[in-house]
């Protein structure tokens, strides 16, 4: 007789808080990991962008140049540049090492909610309350965008890029996917204003959160509804959602001070992680490890799995 195969190790969830960082930049509007997960960015209501080593709790650099609160930021694949967008309607390209502004892109008619680099970091994509997604060439000296995607009927809340595709979520209740190779746009109607969108890490699905306190997992190509996830509260604010590092769990901020984790396949609630008493404004999931950053008020929290032991006692 054959012995049963050992079960693969269940994915661990980041439920142990290792650090809380007081960011000293007013309210933290967004927190983002860099490409390899060693550093993070925080966007402040005080117009600054800050770069941290979250495990050590050290501030590495402050980037000043926005005229109003910073709402989103992203790092390039080689860690040499950052981009950010904010309430001053501008998109800023930064040199990481010097802290200097490389370019300021102006053209949006309202605040910039969301920014992303393409995979080569040659183009910045920005989504604005003005209902447009604009594509800015980082290498060109021309002031105008190389492309404007203006199909949305209301503000853009979320933009994600994957290979040759752009995913844009709008307050008009639609998620639009632009296939740049084919020159096509497809649209999925959710009905409720979209707060966040993302691709699954395997590229097969899209995750959508909206103001009806529901997350939906769709088949990227067919638009088929694969799963719905409820239990959290999202009725007023633009909150982040994502998938865990192995696509096993759906993760979302909530207005009741928790972060919710659902089993992707079962749809069942796996964990409601208590962060604090206010809205969990933003979150970021590590690209390779069960590691989570959350933002609440003026601070960020750093979470790892229960079995995690920091090397050299850094935790």
UniProtKB/Swiss-Prot annotation:
InterPro entries, sorted: G-protein_beta_WD-40_rep, WD40/YVTN_repeat-like_dom_sf, WD40_repeat_CS, WD40_repeat_dom_sf, WD40_rpt, WD_repeat_MORG1
GO (cellular component) term, any one: nucleus
Tissue specificity field: Highly expressed in testis and brain. Expressed at intermediate level in heart, liver and kidney. Weakly expressed in spleen and lung and absent in muscle.
Keyword Repeat tagged: yes
CDD domains per UniProt: WD40
One GO term (biological process): response to hypoxia
Subcellular location: Cytoplasm; Lysosome; Nucleus
Domain of life: Eukaryota
Repeat (WD) residue spans along the chain: 23-62, 65-104, 107-146, 151-188, 190-228, 231-272, 275-313
Main location: cytoplasm
Claim: Nucleus is one of the keywords in the record: yes
Gene3D superfamilies (UniProt xref): YVTN repeat-like/Quinoprotein amine dehydrogenase
PROSITE patterns found in the cross-reference section: WD_REPEATS_1 (PS00678), WD_REPEATS_2 (PS50082), WD_REPEATS_REGION (PS50294)
PANTHER family: WD REPEAT DOMAIN-CONTAINING PROTEIN 83, WD40 REPEAT PROTEIN
Protein purpose: Molecular scaffold protein for various multimeric protein complexes. Acts as a module in the assembly of a multicomponent scaffold for the ERK pathway, linking ERK responses to specific agonists. At low concentrations it enhances ERK activation, whereas high concentrations lead to the inhibition of ERK activation. Also involved in response to hypoxia by acting as a negative regulator of HIF1A/HIF-1-alpha via its interaction with EGLN3/PHD3. May promote degradation of HIF1A. May act by recruiting signaling complexes to a specific upstream activator. May also be involved in pre-mRNA splicing.
UniProt record similarity statement: Belongs to the WD repeat MORG1 family.
Official protein name in the record: WD repeat domain-containing protein 83
């Amino acid at each position: 007789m054959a012995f049963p195969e050992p079960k693969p190790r269940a994915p661990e969830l980041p439920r142990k808080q290792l650090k809380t960082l007081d960011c000293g930049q007013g309210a933290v509007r967004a927190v983002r990991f860099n490409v390899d997960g060693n550093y993070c960015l925080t966007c402040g209501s005080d117009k600054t962008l800050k770069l941290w080593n979250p495990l050590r709790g050290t501030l590495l650099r402050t980037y000043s140049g926005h005229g109003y609160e910073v709402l989103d930021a992203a790092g390039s694949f080689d860690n040499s540049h950052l981009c950010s967008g904010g309430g001053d309607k501008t998109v800023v390209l930064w040199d990481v090492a010097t802290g200097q502004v490389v370019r300021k892109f102006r053209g949006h008619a309202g605040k910039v909610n969301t920014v992303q680099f393409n995979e080569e970091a040659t183009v910045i994509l920005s989504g604005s309350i003005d209902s447009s997604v604009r594509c800015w060439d980082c290498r060109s000296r021309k002031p105008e965008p190389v492309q404007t995607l203006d199909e949305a009927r209301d503000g853009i809340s979320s933009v994600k890029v994957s290979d040759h595709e752009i995913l844009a979520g709008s307050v008009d209740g639609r998620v639009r996917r632009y296939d740049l190779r084919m020159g096509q746009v497809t649209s999925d109607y959710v009905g409720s204003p979209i707060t966040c969108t993302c691709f699954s890490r395997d590229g097969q699905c899209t995750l959508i959160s909206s103001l009806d306190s529901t997350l939906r997992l769709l088949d990227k190509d067919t638009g088929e509804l694969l799963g719905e996830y409820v239990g959290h509260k999202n009725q007023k604010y633009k909150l982040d959602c994502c998938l865990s590092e192995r696509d096993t769990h759906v993760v979302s901020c909530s207005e009741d001070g928790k972060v919710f984790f659902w089993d992707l396949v079962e749809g069942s609630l796996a964990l409601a992680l208590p962060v604090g008493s206010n809205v969990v404004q933003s979150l970021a999931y590590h690209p390779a490890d069960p590691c989570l950053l959350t933002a609440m008020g003026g601070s960020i929290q750093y979470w790892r799995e229960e079995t995690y032991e920091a090397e050299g006692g850094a935790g």
